[in-house]
């Protein structure tokens, strides 16, 4: 019988290393390998907010594997990058290694890593998800703002929102959170 490891989707929280959950920190320290997304800057250097968080948490850097996720509206290159990472993850877990795949904020909330989580589950290796603090929750707390009270409604939409939908929400006096804002800069 083959010895297989486990896969964890590890939420890193909104960027402040003190806002990572205890469960996520324990997982980061326990896994054998950590996959961490990054992007290339205009100057061609790799940058990764996730890696910055891991460094601030003093996670063992020898087990971190930084991978590039191309950022563009055409997601084909990013999907290819995720496919490559999934191949590496599957190889590792089949050899008995435990693997963490990091995501900023919460790994189940507007996370690009969901492509990998789904693909790994389809391959017969479900990902144990570890919840995190989404950025909009942390932002509200940082300024003492209650996002919603009692019967108020909260609407979360992606940055590529349609202008009419945005106006309807504003007229309806609902609390609105727009995620992935660079996608909708032209609209805003």
Model-derived segments and their meaning:
Residues 105-172:
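Class I SAM-dependent methyltransferase SAM-binding "motif I" and its flanking Rossmann-like core
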Residues 37, 160, 179-183:
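Structural motif
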């Amino acid at each position: 019988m083959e010895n297989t490891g486990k896969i964890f989707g590890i939420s890193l929280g909104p960027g402040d290393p003190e806002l990572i959950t205890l469960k996520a920190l324990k997982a980061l320290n326990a896994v054998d390998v950590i996959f961490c997304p990054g992007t290339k800057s205009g100057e061609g250097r790799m940058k990764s907010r996730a890696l910055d968080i891991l460094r601030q948490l003093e996670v063992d850097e020898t087990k971190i594997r930084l991978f590039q996720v191309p950022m563009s509206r055409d997601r084909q290159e990013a999907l290819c990058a995720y496919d490559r990472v999934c191949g590496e993850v599957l190889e590792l877990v089949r050899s008995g290694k435990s693997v963490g795949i990091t995501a900023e904020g919460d790994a189940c909330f507007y996370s690009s890593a969901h492509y990998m989580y789904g693909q790994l589950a389809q391959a017969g290796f479900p990902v144990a998800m570890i919840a995190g603090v989404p950025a909009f929750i942390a932002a509200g707390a940082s300024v003492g703002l209650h996002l919603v009270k009692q019967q108020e409604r909260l609407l979360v939409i992606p940055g590529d929102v349609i202008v009419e939908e945005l106006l309807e929400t504003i007229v309806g006096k609902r609390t609105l959170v727009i995620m992935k804002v660079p996608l909708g800069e032209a609209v805003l």
